[in-house]
Each structure stands twice: as structure tokens, then as C-alpha cells.
Amino acid sequence: MSASTKFHHKDTLLSIDIKRMKLHKRGMCSGIFTRCGLLIWAVFLASNLFAQEPAKGPATVAELQQKLTAHVNEARFASAMWGVKIVSVDTGKTLFDHNAQKLFSPASNSKLYTVALALDRLGADYKIKTSLYAAAKPDSSGVLKGDLIVYGRGDPTINARLHGENIFAALQPLVAALTNAGVKRIAGDLVGDDSFIKGPPYGSGWAWDDAEYYYGAEISALTINDNTLKVTVKPGEKAGAACKLSLSPETSYLTLSNRTTTAEKGARRTISFYRPLNENVVYVSGQMGLEEGAYSDEVTVHNPAGLFVAWFKQALERNGVKIGGKLRTMGWLERKSEPIDCEKLVELGSVESLSMADIAREVMKPSQNLYTDLLLAEVGEKNRAAESRESRRGEETSEDLGIRELNKFLGEAGVKRGDVLFEEGSGLSRNNLTTPNATVALLQFMNRHKASTAYLNALPIAGVDGTLRSRMKGTPAANNVKAKTGTLRWANSLSGHVTTAAGEHLIFSIMLNRYHSVDGRGSGRAEIDVIPVWLAGLAAKSEQR
């Protein structure tokens, strides 16, 4: 992770890696910060930008248009590209259009599309099932002869965060499902099967050096604890001693290689983490000063299904269930030579995820990459099952099928063909492209959709929650703008809804690519935020079409 400065949110982060000078993200958008100095600096930049604007919003639409035109054409954006589309829901009138037909890197605005697809194809009440399969029921003494297969379908909600930071509380419903079936001992192996999702564990176009960071967690049908662990580093008892390391939740599935040193009091912290690809060893290096407070960050695990069954074994043993065999996993490649037919197995029990409406909030508010790509895979596999007789689709990945269904859905939503070019669902890939026109059309369609309430409620609210928690505070946009953020290095976006001071409902999409501040005025996010603030303060309504 190198010596780095980080902006943290509870569930998402932006990090500026000073050594690599690289912007990272989980969802590539950030709202809640835990590095106080940087929080003050970020707020200063944003507030300084807003402070230059008059407290009163534009009096007329014409004045708004003049301000917007002047803003996007300022000299500091000479090497950047703006795309802006603003439409009135009430009148259908376009208030502003600047490069709205051009393709941009949307970053996590991609999630607007994937979540809309999931709500449309699966429904707001849909739940994802995790099953316990065996060849037969347990005998009269509670012995299960043969293996127990934990078959996942991509439930993202089995994690400590949603269960009081207790991973065993998260697994307890699955334990109860097994014990309710009368199982007291498993004679065979405990098998973690994540073959439901077919394809590599990373989204198409993801950068390899994102894989160790929690926003780049592996995609697995047996996802557990967001497929991450928290590493905490504390200084040793004296200068020269190694720092103290710990993992949370505790596990031996991933090991820590301690290369750290406790420096003299007040020394600069240089702690970094490195997990090689396809390994479950994290090398912790660098130093921290004596008596310094604890430093924590999250790292990903390789083959999360293995971590799932490791913790599930512990949970079973805590409840008196013995396991005679070993732990192993089966993925989509292993199942090519040893296929599984769930219909021929006995389902001993199952658990279900939160509803799709709830998952949508867990995706959009913190901008959660892993969950988004799990939803895309879920839609893809449902499509495969619906067309199982068409063997030509047999070799396509879950992601391929999900993207195919997304393109079909966008046609139904009235989005122009060629305006959305996606490879994966979260926006972590720079190969994803879309236009402000397409994004506004999608938002208009979802505003009329039967799942419109679930979709709108999933969006972050300016100055209140999610990745907008710290943005636009103290402005007319606060507790008003509901929008999805997007941030990659050199790519920022914000698309959603706002109500003007005149009471008019507007939908907007703002995209800024390739902007680099050379005069210290502010970040791409701050440059974007002035626009919804102006919209919220607009005193006049647009004319009827």
C-alpha cells in the first residue's frame, strides 16, 4: 500500500498513494473520512469553492445557463472534458446540455445501471439463497454420511458489519439451518462451492494492482465479510521492537508477515501492506512511532470460499457439530470436470439475503464494488437458467450474460444504442463508458419504474449519508440532492435528482474527465458540486414544453 495518505469512509475509501501517486477507491467514491487532517483540508477546498459563490441561487433559468456555460469553459478545464445534462421531470424541458452525447468514464456512476438492472430483472423483494446440500439426510443418530456442500449464489450480506461486528452471528442462521435438519456430525468433507458464478474472480478491465485493496475484493458466490479482513498495527513496547499486528475478524486463513519496526516517539508512520496475487499472506512493512495510536486498513483474501468454510467450521463446532473430513472448495473450473446437479441432492436447509431493495442501498450509498458485480452475475445466471436450452451460451461467463442482459434492458429503457459500453458492473474498470444523455434517460426511466422508491432510496443524500455525507453541507443542496457519485483517477461524476428552490424536480448527470487542478482551486468533486448547489438554489421554474 506504500506510504500513503487516505480518505476513509466506513465502507468505502479514496486513497492518495503518495509513493505511487495513485487514486484508489472502493466504489471509487468516498464520503466519511477518518484522517482528520485530510478531512479538514478536503472540507476547506470544497467550502472555499462554495464560499466564492453568492448565497442566493440563480434567479432565472437563463442566469443558470450563463453560470453553467461560464463554469465548464473556464481556462483551468482546457485539458479536461465536461459533460452535463439537466432535465426537468415536471416539464420535460432540457435546461442545459453540454457534451451530453459524448462518451465518458463514469466510474461508480456505472452502479446506477447495474442496480437498475437488478431491480428490474429480479425485483425489489428478491432475495439470494445460500443452500446446504448433501447426498442424503442424516441418519437417526444425526450423522451425515458424505460431504456437506455449502452452495453459494452470491449473497453479499453475510458479514460482520451487518451483525454487530460478529462474524459468527452472521453465520448463525446457516448453522441453525443445519442443526434444524438434525445434523450433529459430518462424516465427510465440508465443501465450499462457489461455482454458481462462472468466470474469473475479478471484473473485466480491473487493474491487477487493485486486487489487494478492499475495493478490489474477489467476486465469489460464497462471499463472506465483503471478502476482506481488517489489519491493525500498533507500536511495540519500545523503539526498535516490531509493531504488534492483529486481524479482525480473527482467522488463520490469512497470515501476516511482520516486517515492521517501532520508531522513536513522533516518527513519521510509513506502514504499508502487500498481498501478492493468489496468495493469502500479507506483508506488513514500515514503521510507526512509539505511543502512536493504532492504524488499521482492510485487505482482501484470495479464494473467499475457503475463508467462508473455515469460519463456518468454527461456527458449527461452537454449536456442537463435529466434522470428520477436511475443508475444501469447488469453483467453476473444478465443476467443469466434476459437475454438480443440485436437483439430485438433498437440500438440508438454506438462508436468504436481505431484499434486493436493501442490497441496493448497501451498494449505492457506500459505493460497494463487490456487491455490484455480484448483482450483475446474479442477473446473468438467472438469464442462463432461463435459456438453459440454448447451448451456445454455455461458455459465456456470468459477467458476459449480465452485460448482455444490461444491454437488452437499456434498449427497453429507451437508452440510445452505443451510448453505454460496459465490461463490468461496478465502474472499477476504466473500459466502462457512457454518456450524460444515457444516464439521464436511465434515471428518467427508473423514476417511472415500479421499483422507483427502492431505487431513489438507495442513492446517497448530500450532506447526510453515504459517499455524499461530507459534500455540499450548508448549501441548498444539503438534504436535497440524491445522487450517485463516481471517482477514479482523472474521472469524476455525479448523477441524480434535485428539487429547486422553486419546487421543480430536476434530473441531472455531470461528468468531468481528465481534470487535474494546477492552481490548487479544488478537486474534481468540488468543481462538480457547485452545479447541484446552483440547481437547488434556482428560484425560477422552466417553461412548459
Where are the language model's segments positioned?
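Bacterial N-terminal signal peptides
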Residues: 35-48
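A short, well-structured edge-of-sheet supersecondary motif
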Residues: 73-98, 328-329
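Residue-level preference for non-acidic, small/hydrophobic
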Residues: 92, 111-115, 190, 222, ...
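Small-residue-rich helix-loop
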Residues: 95-97, 169, 366, 376-545
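Short active-site loop at a secondary-structure junction
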Residues: 97-117
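A short glycine/serine-rich beta->alpha loop
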Residues: 99-104, 298, 426-429
